[in-house]
């Protein structure tokens, strides 16, 4: 099968969030038995640079064309690409492919590719990755984009992938026909979790005792992640008879909120109990997951949490707010889901953190669910079967 993936950020720009990892994992799995190409841009916090100035490169076995943006600063400010020569190359090359898979539709490359795909009767699929509705940030710009391009891109798609039933309802609100919507979740690469690091490495590096409880957050340091709520809750937690026996580790790249986070930690005078590591990848991230007692995701909005799946792969229980669209199958099964307030979050954390039997049960259930459902081997088979319906 000849497949084209379109992603406005792509590996190695992991700081751009979970969409980069998802699009990479899907393309990587498909490349083993199919002819796969990815087109993306050179944007990241700092422009991506390539050997010998080539922008058509091999990324771990995946053929990728990175279009150079006229302005990286404009891309980061608006999330809109300004890709040099993209229309000319895409117009020429689009006929090579049997199907197109667009990751996030509010991007210039999606406009260009969807247009030429339609002109050449090539089916395309849209996977919004939690960005179906235009809200939270840059709402005015998103609404304008939708009026000019977005609605057309979604409605003309052969199929759209929803992460959850909640996202399915969002597609319906955007005018997508119900029979075009498929539920396709996110997953993890099981191979990356076959040989985990031994317990204690993260704790040793960051001075966390073996007798201390460790709560872990992994994600972008962004306002939407609910870190203000997490700090307020943790402040209450350690001053409720647990001072000195609990540590909180916050792992992830700054996405505009780090200075406010640091300020809030200082205001609460909990610097000795909170560890802010910055981004950790691969082995170092696995060390944090192995050493934690509980994974927490207090987001104000979250369609799916890949880092939560990673914690489940390490047999760790989850606590998340009901703002996360997966809360229905998490709650009482692999962790606890709570309301978006301090008292509810603290109660959920305490219930899981200090009940070892419950914590172990949640962890075992999570690991089983990863092996049975939420891994890229299974999900990729589902995606390929969907592709075949349109070729």
PLM features: residue spans?
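Conserved donor-binding/catalytic core segment of Leloir-type glycosyltransferases
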Residues: 4, 209-225, 231-234, 249
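Nucleotide-sugar donor phosphate/pyrophosphate-binding loop at the beta->alpha transition
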Residues: 123-125, 133-156, 169
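N-terminal subdomain of nucleotide-sugar transferases
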Residues: 1-52, 60
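Glycosyltransferase donor-sugar binding loop
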Residues: 188, 218, 246-260
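Conserved acidic donor-binding segment of nucleotide-sugar-dependent glycosyltransferases
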Residues: 332, 336-343, 351-357
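Short hydrophobic beta-strand element within catalytic cores of glycosyltransferases
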Residues: 317-320
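Aromatic "clamp/platform" in nucleotide-sugar-dependent glycosyltransferases that forms part
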Residues: 300
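Nucleotide-activated donor-binding/catalytic signature segment of Leloir-type glycosyltransferases, i.e.
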Residues: 260-280
């Amino acid at each position: 099968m000849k497949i084209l993936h379109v992603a406005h950020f792509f590996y190695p720009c992991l700081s751009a969030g979970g969409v980069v990892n998802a699009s990479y994992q899907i393309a990587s799995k498909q490349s083993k038995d199919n002819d796969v190409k990815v087109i993306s841009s050179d944007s990241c916090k700092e422009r991506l640079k390539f050997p010998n100035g080539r922008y058509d490169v091999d990324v771990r076995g995946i053929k990728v064309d990175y279009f150079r943006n006229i302005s990286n600063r404009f891309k980061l400010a608006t999330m809109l690409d300004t890709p040099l020569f993209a229309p000319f190359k895409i117009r020429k090359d689009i006929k090579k492919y049997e199907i197109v898979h667009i990751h996030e539709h509010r991007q210039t490359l999606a406009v260009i590719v969807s247009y030429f795909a339609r002109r050449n009767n090539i089916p395309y699929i849209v996977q919004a990755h939690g960005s179906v509705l235009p809200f939270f940030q840059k709402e005015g710009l998103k609404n304008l984009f939708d009026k000019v391009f977005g609605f057309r891109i979604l409605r003309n798609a052969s199929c759209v992938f929803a992460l959850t039933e909640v996202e399915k309802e969002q597609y319906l609100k955007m005018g997508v026909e119900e029979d075009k919507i498929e539920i396709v979740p996110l997953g993890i690469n099981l191979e990356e979790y076959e040989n985990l690091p031994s317990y204690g490495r993260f704790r040793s590096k960051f001075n966390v005792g073996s007798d201390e409880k460790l709560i872990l957050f992994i994600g972008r340091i962004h306002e939407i992640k609910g870190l203000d709520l997490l700090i307020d809750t943790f402040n209450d937690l350690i001053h409720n008879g647990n001072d000195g026996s609990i540590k909180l580790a916050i792992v992830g790249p700054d996405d505009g909120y780090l200075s406010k986070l640091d300020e809030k930690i200082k205001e609460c005078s909990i610097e000795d109990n909170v560890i802010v590591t910055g981004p950790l990848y691969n082995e170092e991230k696995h060390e944090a997951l192995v050493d934690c007692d509980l994974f927490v995701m207090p987001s104000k909005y979250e369609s799916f949490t890949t880092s939560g799946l990673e914690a489940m792969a390490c047999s760790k229980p989850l606590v998340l707010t009901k703002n996360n669209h997966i809360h229905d199958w998490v709650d009482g099964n692999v962790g606890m889901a709570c309301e978006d307030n301090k008292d509810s979050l603290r109660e959920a954390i305490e219930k899981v953190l200090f009940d070892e039997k419950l914590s172990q049960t949640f962890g075992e259930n999570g690991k089983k669910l990863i092996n049975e459902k939420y891994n890229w081997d299974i999900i990729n088979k589902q995606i390929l079967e969907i592709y075949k319906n349109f070729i």
